[in-house]
From Swiss-Prot:
The keyword Kinase applies. This is ATP-dependent 6-phosphofructokinase. Belongs to the phosphofructokinase type A (PFKA) family. ATP-dependent PFK group I subfamily. Prokaryotic clade 'B1' sub-subfamily. It catalyses: beta-D-fructose 6-phosphate + ATP = beta-D-fructose 1,6-bisphosphate + ADP + H(+). It comes from Alkaliphilus metalliredigens (strain QYMF). It is found in: Cytoplasm. ATP binds at G11, R72, C73, G102, D103, G104, S105. One of its GO terms (cellular component) is 6-phosphofructokinase complex. Homotetramer. ADP binds at R21, A22, V23, V24, R25, R154, G185, A186, E187, R211, K213, L214, H215. NCBIfam families: PFKA_ATP, PRK03202.1. Its cofactor is Mg(2+). Catalyzes the phosphorylation of D-fructose 6-phosphate to fructose 1,6-bisphosphate by ATP, the first committing step of glycolysis. Mg(2+) binds at D103.
């Protein structure tokens, strides 16, 4: 393995830069040339590629986003688009590729592997929705960003005696809502894995109000429904003044936590090791405190994990 390409794809997540840095420095340490592919699979198809050196990744470990930028690419989903990408890799003599991203990026990595290009996928998504790995790069930072905002909303919610609904990211996986809801002391946590029970939410809010609670917090994953509409329904049913806040893309930004920097560094270095060992079609993950790798397709076939125990604990502690 002489030349390794690295790209970031799909939604960005804090810690991607730390992973890029690990790929570049680990690769150079092992005598490889590292090529940075800009704007994901789109940049691969259009040959937006340049060689990276040690200076290319100086002072980026603490930065959010991705210096390689990212994009979604419908063209790569087509056979013609993938043939263009393969031709670019052959012309530039890129022997293997590290792909950093979420589910869609992993699908692309699998396609590259099927074309005969050794490819290693590294999980970078704030949603934590790749079931084969305990954590994905960016999830911890997103949790802490949301938790900080919850603390601020709690202050004003208490002052006004309101209920506040906080909508966070998570279309199919409610991990951000679940763990920030527990850590933030939310009265209700609404996630796709469980669904929405408006009557139960209203009952809990009224129960709290009747015993003198000054405020209530509800954390809602975006995959369940809209916070604004839910707020109107709750206010009508309970008479409790309710405000809704949609956090949106603020969750994707910011300096990564120590956990995400370390996780990204370990995963990026493992990806390079695998390619040097001529092992492609692999997904890097973490179980317990151990970095591991497995077949990409097998990784994609593992369903999102749902932490029922934590959800039940959150219910108990929210009484």
């Amino acid at each position: 393995m002489k030349t390794i390409g690295v790209l970031t794809s799909g939604g960005d997540s804090p810690g991607m830069n730390a992973a890029i840095r690990a790929v570049v420095r680990s690769g150079i340490y092992n005598g490889c040339k590292i090529m940075g592919i800009k704007q994901g699979y789109s940049g691969l198809i259009n040959a937006k590629i340049e060689e990276m050196n040690l200076s290319s990744v100086a002072d980026i470990i603490h930065r959010g986003g991705t210096i390689l930028r990212t994009a979604r690419c419908e063209e790569f989903r087509t056979e013609e688009g993938r043939k263009k990408a393969l031709n670019v890799l052959k012309v530039l003599k890129i022997d293997g590729v590290v792909v950093i991203g979420g589910d869609g990026s992993f699908q692309g990595a699998k396609k590259l592997s099927e074309l005969g290009i050794p490819t290693v996928a590294v999980p970078g998504t704030i949603d934590n929705d790749l079931g084969y790995s305990d954590y994905t790069i960016g999830f911890d930072t997103a949790m802490n960003t949301v938790l900080d905002a919850i603390s601020k909303i709690r202050d004003t919610s208490t002052s006004h005696g309101r209920a506040n609904i906080i909508e966070v990211m998570g279309r199919h996986c409610g991990d951000i809502a679940l763990y920030t809801g527990l850590a933030g002391g939310a009265e209700s946590i609404i996630i796709p894995e469980v669904g929405l029970d408006i009557d139960e939410i209203c009952r809990k809010l009224l129960q709290g109000k009747n015993r003198g609670k000054l405020h209530s917090l509800i954390v809602l994953a975006e995959g369940v429904g809209g916070a604004i509409d839910l707020g109107k329904i709750i206010e009508e049913k309970t008479g409790i003044e309710t405000r809704s806040t949609v956090f949106g893309h603020i969750q994707r930004g910011g300096s990564p936590t120590a956990f995400d920097r370390i996780l990204a560094s370990k995963m990026g270095a493992r990806a390079v090791d695998l390619l040097i060992e001529e092992k492609g079609n692999r997904a890097v993950g973490i179980k317990g405190n151990q970095i591991f790798d497995m077949d990409i397709e097998e990784a994609l076939n593992i369903e999102n994990k749902f932490d029922q125990e934590t959800f039940e604990l959150a219910k108990i502690l929210s009484i």
